[in-house]
From Swiss-Prot:
UniProt cross-references to PANTHER family, sorted A to Z: 5-KETO-D-GLUCONATE 5-REDUCTASE (PTHR43669), ALCOHOL DEHYDROGENASE, PUTATIVE (AFU_ORTHOLOGUE AFUA_3G03445)-RELATED (PTHR43669:SF3)
Pfam family, one: adh_short_C2
Organism of derivation: Sarocladium schorii (Acremonium strictum (strain IMI 501407))
Keywords: NADP, Oxidoreductase
Use in biotechnology or industry: Xenovulene A is a natural product exhibiting little structural resemblance with classical benzodiazepines yet is able to displace high-affinity ligand binding to the benzodiazepine site of the gamma-aminobutyrate A (GABAA) receptor and could be potentially used as an anti-depressant with reduced addictive properties.
Induction or repression: Expression is significantly up-regulated under xenovulene A producing condition.
EC number: 1.1.1.-
GO molecular function terms attached to this record: oxidoreductase activity
Superkingdom, natural source: Eukaryota
Descriptive protein name: Oxidoreductase asL5
Family: Belongs to the short-chain dehydrogenases/reductases (SDR) family.
Signal peptide location: none
Length: 249
């Protein structure tokens, strides 16, 4: 349990919130006093997450690529809480494919989830954030959006676009009392990363950053809580990297 209670009374939505970084952020937000709605595609993962998160969590099943699902999410938030203070647009998709083998379907999936999904996640949240008098938006980026990675070019391009969304929207959202920032992780030991890389792959991947280790989802969740809170009140349109220094070398 966090001793800091920076989010008491706040309501948050986290897409991709049932596992990995999203779940770690949800756990930290609740520890700091927030009520959290997690949103994701797999009902069994959502059920397990809410069982672990406790009574200050709710789950809504759906995909950020389906506008009707996002409508249901925000209807649930409105019905139970009335307004919304924090949105973490964390749902994402990525595929490792070298140039020359990229398909249209892969582009549609990655950009549909990472870019279109983020746009409509935020757009749908704005009326409820206006009811709260403003708040904080966190977009999950990636260090690959800055550094580039040959097998992840489509994914990296989609995350570079996320950074541009924050910069493009910051002035407009200021007038609504809303701050927007990008949280860009890399080298994080999520379950998906462990399954994809294996134990040996994780060890090799860890050596690519200056700290020579993999980060933990909880370390990203702690930074998300900072960005969600008033401690980051003079930050907007910023990108914060939680990647062991990977994007800086």
């Amino acid at each position: 349990m966090s001793a800091i209670q920076r989010l008491t009374g706040k309501t948050a939505v986290i897409t991709g919130g049932a596992t990995g970084i999203g779940f770690a952020a949800a756990k930290r937000f609740i520890e700091e006093g927030a009520f959290v709605f997690i949103f994701g595609r797999r009902q069994e993962k959502l059920d397990a997450a809410t069982a672990a998160l406790g009574p200050n969590s709710r789950a809504v099943q759906g995909s950020v690529t389906e506008l009707a699902d996002l409508d249901r999410l925000y209807e649930a938030v409105k019905a139970e809480r009335g307004s919304l203070d924090i949105v973490m647009a964390n749902a994402g998709a990525g595929m490792a494919t070298p140039l020359g083998k990229i398909t249209g379907e892969q582009c549609d999936i990655v950009f549909g989830t990472n870019l279109k999904g983020t746009i409509f996640t935020i757009q749908g949240a704005l009326p409820l954030m206006a009811q709260a008098g403003g708040g904080s938006i966190i977009l999950t980026g990636s260090s690959s959006g800055t550094t580039g990675a040959p097998p992840l070019s489509v994914y990296g391009a989609s995350k570079a676009a996320i950074r541009n969304l924050a910069r493009s929207w910051a002035g407009t959202l200021r007038d609504e009392g809303i701050r927007i920032n990008v949280l860009s992780p890399a080298s994080i030991a999520t379950e998906i990363a462990k399954e994809a890389l294996g134990e040996q792959g994780m060890k090799m991947f860890a050596q690519q950053n200056p700290l020579k280790r993999m980060g933990q989802p909880e370390e990203v969740g702690a930074v998300a809580a900072f960005l969600a809170s008033s401690d980051s009140s003079f930050m907007t349109a910023s990108e914060v990297s939680v990647d062991g220094g990977l994007a800086q070398i």
